[in-house]
Curated annotation (Swiss-Prot):
It comes from Mus musculus. This is Max-interacting protein 1. Residues 30-76, 160-228 are annotated as: Disordered. It is found in: Nucleus. Keywords: DNA-binding, Nucleus, Repressor, Transcription, Transcription regulation.
Length: 228
């Protein structure tokens, strides 16, 4: 206890010395380089600085909050504009009827939900019908293949018969053509023989004429001899 009192007294003495030193420094106009405890007046002058820093912090935070608020307002404005545009498009897509002149957002969304359910039900029915048609198409295709089996064999047989007949016909036509060619060649031979015969006949006739003329000449010469 006594020791604590001595420490307090010592601190009071140091404080008194510091105050005296500060007063002398102020009077003489120079500062002391001796480290000492801060004066009560200096301690009293620090809170205004803290207040100024708090003011700066508060002003900076207020500027930040103002910027954040303006950004939030801009985002909210864009969101509402986008929502309004979506609602206008929804009015065009959903059949509302002529009696609905004014629509609330809730009523429009309920009608959109009902319309979507109706479209989904129609899509399910269409899908089921499409599957039935595909099954029927596969069945008819198999049936057609089964029916085309015997017909295909008959068609192949008829094609083979037709090709055989056509080949026989072509052979007979070829034989007829050969016969015609031979007859044509024979007629050409007869013509040559006829022509040679006629030529020989002409030669015989000319020889007969020459003989007759010779006989006439000889008879004429005989007559002349008798006359002389």
């Amino acid at each position: 206890m006594e020791r604590v009192r001595m420490i307090n007294v010592q601190r009071l003495l140091e404080a008194a010395e510091f105050l005296e030193r500060r007063e002398r420094e102020c009077e003489h106009g120079y500062a002391s380089s001796f480290p000492s405890m801060p004066s009560p007046r200096l301690q009293h002058s620090k809170p205004p600085r803290r207040l100024s820093r708090a003011q700066k912090h508060s002003s900076g935070s207020s500027n930040t909050s103002t910027a954040n608020r303006s950004t939030h307002n801009e985002l909210e404005k864009n969101r509402r504009a986008h929502l309004r545009l979506c609602l206008e498009r929804l009015k065009v897509l959903i059949p509302l009827g002529p009696d609905c002149t004014r629509h609330t957002t809730l009523g429009l969304l309920n009608k959109a939900k009902a319309h979507i359910k109706k479209l989904e039900e129609a899509e399910r029915k269409s899908q089921h019908q499409l599957e039935n048609l595909e099954r029927e198409q596969r069945f008819l295709k198999r049936r057609l293949e089964q029916l085309q089996g015997p017909q295909e064999m008959e068609r192949i047989r008829m094609d083979s018969i037709g090709s055989t007949i056509s080949s026989d016909r072509s052979d007979s036509e070829r034989e007829e053509i050969e016969v015609d060619v031979e007859s044509t060649e024979f007629s050409h031979g007869e013509a040559d023989s006829v022509s040679t015969t006629s030529i020989s006949d002409l030669d015989d006739h000319s020889s007969l004429q020459s003989v007759g003329s010779d006989e006439g000449y000889s008879s004429a010469s005989v007559k002349l001899s008798f006359a002389s």
